[in-house]
Amino acid sequence: MEQLTIGKRFTLTCPEGFRPVTKEERDRFHMPESDDSLGLIREDDRIVASMGWKEVSAFAGVLLHVISPAASVEASVSRDMAGYGYRKEKSLSREIGGQKAEGFRYTYTAGDNFMVGESYVIRSGRSLTFFHVYLPDELREQGLARWNELLDAVQSL
């Protein structure tokens, strides 16, 4: 199994069935091409996952102590997906790589497909690490189980 690095904070042993996305898939899924991000796909379940890391400015770092990073990401996702029938289902919290992660689950429509997404954010000082997944709603139960296996495989550096 392939060992991957997420930013400067986490590693991931790619679980069975997942593989890194190709450049063509990155373009198709509108994923940034950067050393600070990676994308994974599990074709059997049509799961697309992306992870990324960024450091924010000192000013934004101060705001992160006032505004929840997960709430900020949720506002951004809801704005970006407004034309796709975005609907938040619930807030989420869990550990990823031994760190507290806050997130949310939502639904949206992509073409004729009803989709489910989850996003998590880990804040550490001025660093933010993001974890996102997108999967068809008809595969929700098995897809979210695979997603949780992937998140369970994340380790802190």
Task: Kindly give the residue locations of the regions a language model identified.
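Conserved polar/disulfide-associated segments of primarily extracytoplasmic proteins
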Residues: E24-G117, R123, L128-T129
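Generic beta-strand structural signal
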Residues: T5, R123-S124, S156
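Generic detection of long, well-ordered alpha-helical segments
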Residues: K8, I67-A71, R140-L144
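Phosphate/oxyanion-binding loops and surfaces in catalytic or ligand/nucleic-acid-binding neighborhoods
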Residues: V21, P69, L157
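N-terminal "mature-domain start" segment
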Residues: M1-S37
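Surface-exposed amphipathic alpha-helical segments
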Residues: E16-F18, T129-L157
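His/acidic/aromatic-lined binding-pocket segments of jelly-roll/cupin-type domains
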Residues: L12, Y120-V121
